[in-house]
Amino acid sequence: MIRSSTGRVAAIAIIFLFIVALFQNNDTGTYAFLPSLSQSSKLPSYPPTWLRERMALSEKSWKKSVELREKMAQSHPANPKIPFFPTDFLKYPFTIWDFFPATWTCPHDFQRVGRLGDGGKWVCGMSIYESLPEPKPISAEAVEVREAAIAAAESGLVIYSFGINGESSFEAEMLERVPSARIWGYDFSVDGWGKQIPMTERHRTFFKKVGLGKDDEHDASPAFWTLPALMKENNHTYIDILKIDIEGSEYDALDTFMDAFDGIQSASGKSVLPIGQVMIELHLGNGDSANEKVDFDRFRKWWERLERMGMRPAWIEINLFAVTLGSNKSNPRCTEYVWVNAKDERSVLWKQ
């Protein structure tokens, strides 16, 4: 009886384990007995299947918008010198921003970070960033030396912020919600971060009173640095999040950045910008003067080079302050975009 009972119990246990193993499935949808052993024998797919499928749908939507962009541009007789804000609506029912819609959908959550008005930003995959483990504590020496890069430069989530102007609600919330976040800030017009960042979090930030520019002019007043030079100074090869609002200087500054990585193997891939995502405010004139530095042709070539190097428009928010403030009303010449790097091989967004 004892032997018989023991045998029945063992048989039931074996059957139970088999059923549990049967319902354990891997990312590709196949089943495996003892899945922990079978999965350890091969690397997981990258990105996961569900994520690749969502990204493929986004890429398809974006490519369609690129085709429509070309057709719409060809329909205007002044192409490539198309006015930013045509006055004949019946003939040309579009503005500059309609050529560059946010057609690439973030496959993760999209959350507002920072205040709801000017200064706050939309972030693709905020929950992914929140889930990242906190890096090792920063040494006391690194905290004291504020004109030196933070120790263990690339540990944690690396954020660069250009154009602070005394408003740091975005940075403050990122520090509060993302334990791994480390932020490097630059602005030649202010002396430091806004009051929104509490002193208890300042040890995770670094500030330098310089501007972001096309050329390195470190001895000028004010001083300007290029983005590649700042990354080298900080011992960085990759930026997870780039926030940039530099009042029209973004075109030349990002040209220099693209020059540094076009045709080069970076942390993200060949001819791919080593940035996970970008929150940027774009500034334009009215686009109707021969003296303007950025016209439609210049803007489109600049934009499409960014796309070629991985960037995809995932969010757009028209800044209406120029339209609504004051007595001298203006066209909507400033617009916030979120670009997500769809080609980036290093982004934490594609590993979840």
Which sequence ranges carry the predicted segments?
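Conserved S-adenosyl-L-methionine
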Residues: 163-164, 243-245
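SAM cofactor-binding core of SAM-dependent methyltransferases
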Residues: 104-221
